[in-house]
């Protein structure tokens, strides 16, 4: 299913991407800041495809709207409280909107060290304090430096394509770029539902062909124990 979505939508967006500064090989014509979208602000992206004759694309709506968030390392160094530097980039509601955004945003391997890039269901903030996330937890995968790009894409496609049996329990995903490694975490909202969490963890590994053992940590444990928090579930 992931491969089908990629193949069916890639051709539809060629014309849109051409006038947004993306070449056919997927590279941007100009160097961007981390998380920056080609063409300026969100209003430009949302209106540009409809402003030119002949570039209209039939929309394929997603079951949920999703929002990309970005936390830049330079802003985090000045923040007063955790999460205060986190900002939403754009909300998308269709397959076409997703691809036009994805093709204009840096991959994890191109982000600065210390950057965090999120994709969460609309109206859910990627914070422990968010009411939807408060009783949840996260599965985490670890990758060597600059090796998470494909797995990040496949994680996004599995989420927005509703490929998980317990998709309603998923809040979103985040990729953390650090000095020696990158991590992708899948956030869920009901950590105590063991069967649902195990199902999500197993399916996630299958979707992106990840062979190492992964662990699930409750947000509550992470808040109180920090780095000492232990995995409650593993798959």
Swiss-Prot record:
UniProt feature, compositional bias: Basic and acidic residues: 16-25
One Gene Ontology CC term in the entry: nucleus
Name the UniProt record assigns to this protein: Eukaryotic translation initiation factor 4E-1
Entry keyword annotation includes Disulfide bond: yes
GO biological process, one term: regulation of translation
Consequence recorded when altering residue 75 to P: In strain: Autumn Gold, Desert Storm, Salinas 88 and Vanguard 75, alleles mo1(2) and Ls-eIF4E(2)
Biased composition (Acidic residues): 26-36
Job of this protein: Component of the protein complex eIF4F, which is involved in the recognition of the mRNA cap, ATP-dependent unwinding of 5'-terminal secondary structure and recruitment of mRNA to the ribosome. Recognizes and binds the 7-methylguanosine-containing mRNA cap during an early step in the initiation of protein synthesis and facilitates ribosome binding by inducing the unwinding of the mRNAs secondary structures. Key component of recessive resistance to potyviruses.
Disordered: annotated segments: 16-56
Residues annotated to bind mRNA: 78-83, 110, 128-129, 178-183, 223-227
Family under the similarity heading: Belongs to the eukaryotic initiation factor 4E family.
Record's comment on post-translational modification: According to the redox status, the Cys-133-Cys-171 disulfide bridge may have a role in regulating protein function by affecting its ability to bind capped mRNA.
The encoding gene: eIF4E
Chief location category: nucleus
Disulfide bonds: 133-171
Region (EIF4G-binding): 60-63, 70-106, 154-163
Self-association state and partner proteins as the record states: EIF4F is a multi-subunit complex, the composition of which varies with external and internal environmental conditions. It is composed of at least EIF4A, EIF4E and EIF4G. EIF4E is also known to interact with other partners. In higher plants two isoforms of EIF4F have been identified, named isoform EIF4F and isoform EIF(iso)4F. Isoform EIF4F has subunits p220 and p26, whereas isoform EIF(iso)4F has subunits p82 and p28.
GO molecular function: RNA binding; translation initiation factor activity
Biological classification of the source: Eukaryota, Viridiplantae, Streptophyta, Embryophyta, Tracheophyta
Localization: Nucleus; Cytoplasm
